[in-house]
């Protein structure tokens, strides 16, 4: 897998850029604030997501209404032209070899990228939400089914939140609450299942690498914390689905009272410790 070329229009600080890359190692250098990190961000965006922008509109240059990215990549033993059109106030448009894609998960199924940057410290500083984002970014590139389930869960979560928020003025909205809870549990069960298995693999590889970085002075441990009724996050999605339904039923009254979604994997956390072996 490699990227051979990149074209940008109105992306971050680039009015226009055409770049070609060597198939081996490329060194990108320049003065501060010239756009080195923006260039790397654009490459990573071809996997479907920005590592630092919460909204796509943040990627569009100030004073214009759109931005375009094109990447020539080689993957799956063939060439791909990946394209992204970003518009203020409208959904982005993604294409692969001219064919419109449904979501960023389909991009990540073609081109997988790994980006290391100073902002990675946010995994430590920012807490559970940032770590969930890390899990989502990684697993979406590995499991297209996860990307679809994540997009569906986010859509359902947004709708259910709206129902709870507006139910005080329109109590009839609560008639749809159980249907949304069931659909969220179905999508959420897949998220928990895939997250648990990814973290299991991460636990097998990360401690040794972390130990090398710390010169053996620290020992990394990772633990996945999810909905309390889920007894085994590595179980099959159907088992987890039933346990999520139980948790949602137990929290139904509290959700209505607080007008918030209190139950589901949107509150998951990846916990870590890195003590000295002497501790």
Ranges and model annotations:
Residues 11, 15-96, 145-146, 153, ...:
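Conserved P-loop NTP-binding catalytic core
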Residues 1-15:
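N-terminal pre-Walker A segment at the start of P-loop NTPase domains
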Residues 47-130, 136-142, 146, 203-208, ...:
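Nucleotide-state sensing region of NTPase/ATPase domains
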Residues 196-270:
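Amphipathic heptad-repeat alpha-helical coiled-coil/stalk segments that mediate oligomerization
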Residues 122-214:
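An accessory alpha-helical subdomain
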Residues 272-279:
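Conserved small/polar residues in nucleotide/adenosyl-binding loops
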């Amino acid at each position: 897998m490699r990227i051979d070329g990149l074209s940008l229009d109105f992306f971050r600080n680039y009015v226009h850029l055409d770049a070609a890359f060597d198939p081996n190692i490329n060194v990108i250098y320049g003065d501060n604030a010239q756009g080195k990190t923006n260039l790397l961000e654009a490459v990573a965006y071809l996997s479907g997501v920005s590592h630092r922008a919460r909204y796509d509109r943040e990627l569009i240059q100030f004073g214009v209404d759109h931005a375009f990215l094109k990447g020539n990549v080689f993957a799956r033993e063939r060439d791909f032209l990946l394209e992204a059109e970003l518009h203020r106030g409208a959904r982005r448009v993604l294409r692969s070899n001219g064919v419109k894609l449904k979501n960023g998960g389909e991009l990540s199924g073609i081109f997988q990228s790994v980006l290391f940057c100073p902002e990675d410290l946010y995994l430590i500083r920012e807490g559970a939400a940032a770590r969930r984002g890390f899990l989502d970014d990684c697993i979406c590139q590995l499991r297209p089914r996860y990307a679809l389930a994540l997009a569906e869960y986010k859509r359902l979560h947004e709708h259910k939140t709206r129902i709870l928020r507006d139910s005080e003025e329109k109590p009839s909205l609560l008639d749809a609450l159980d249907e949304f809870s069931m659909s969220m549990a179905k999508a959420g069960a897949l998220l928990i299942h895939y997250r648990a298995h990814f973290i299991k693999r991460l636990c097998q590889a990360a401690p040794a690498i972390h130990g090398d970085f710390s010169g053996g002075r620290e020992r990394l441990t990772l633990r996945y914390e999810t909905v309390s009724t889920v007894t085994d996050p590595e179980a099959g999605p159907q088992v987890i689905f039933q346990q999520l339904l139980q948790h949602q039923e137990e929290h139904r009254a509290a959700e209505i009272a607080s007008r918030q979604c209190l139950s589901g994997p949107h509150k998951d956390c990846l916990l870590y410790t890195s003590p000295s072996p002497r501790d």
